[in-house]
From Swiss-Prot:
One GO BP annotation of this record: adaptive immune response
Keywords: Adaptive immunity, Cytokine, Disulfide bond, Glycoprotein, Growth factor, Immunity, Secreted, Signal
Predominant location: secreted
Disulfide bonds listed in the record: 78-126
Signal peptide per UniProt: 1-20
Sample GO molecular function, one term: cytokine activity
Protein's name in the database: Interleukin-2
InterPro entries: 4_helix_cytokine-like_core (IPR009079), IL-2 (IPR000779), IL-2_CS (IPR030477)
Gene Ontology cellular component terms for the protein in this record: extracellular space
Lineage, broadest ranks: Eukaryota, Metazoa, Chordata, Craniata, Vertebrata
Physiological role: Cytokine produced by activated CD4-positive helper T-cells and to a lesser extend activated CD8-positive T-cells and natural killer (NK) cells that plays pivotal roles in the immune response and tolerance. Binds to a receptor complex composed of either the high-affinity trimeric IL-2R (IL2RA/CD25, IL2RB/CD122 and IL2RG/CD132) or the low-affinity dimeric IL-2R (IL2RB and IL2RG). Interaction with the receptor leads to oligomerization and conformation changes in the IL-2R subunits resulting in downstream signaling starting with phosphorylation of JAK1 and JAK3.
Glycosylation-annotated residues: 23
Amino acid sequence: MYKLQLLSCIALTLALVANSAPTLSSTKDTKKQLEPLLLDLQFLLKEVNNYENLKLSRMLTFKFYMPKKATELKHLQCLMEELKPLEEVLNLAQSKNSHLTNIKDSMNNINLTVSELKGSETGFTCEYDDETVTVVEFLNKWITFCQSIYSTMT
């Protein structure tokens, strides 16, 4: 009687692993990777909000694209595609500021973390929303995305 249950359990486990269902260790790893990504995005938002009014108003003229529906880690591809424009906007505003190194470090961290989190899937293409967002909205939405993913893993 127990053999049948054990065999069913083994078969189910193999089916889940074969279909790349997240395992407990991969969930823990993902959570560990999401934490620094979230912190880096929050740091950038803090830096943006610390600019003088003139610089912030200039930064708000640049527009960014958000995916129509970001609910899975694969949607981080959309963030990755907008990292270069984000870095250019932050560099423009930081031209004479000492925080430039910290921003570059955060951007590099975000790039590496997003690459690891989204995995090797290359066939995914982003479907962007028709409306663009400001740099503040962009960072806030990605922070919310990370928090949402993180909360589903706890």
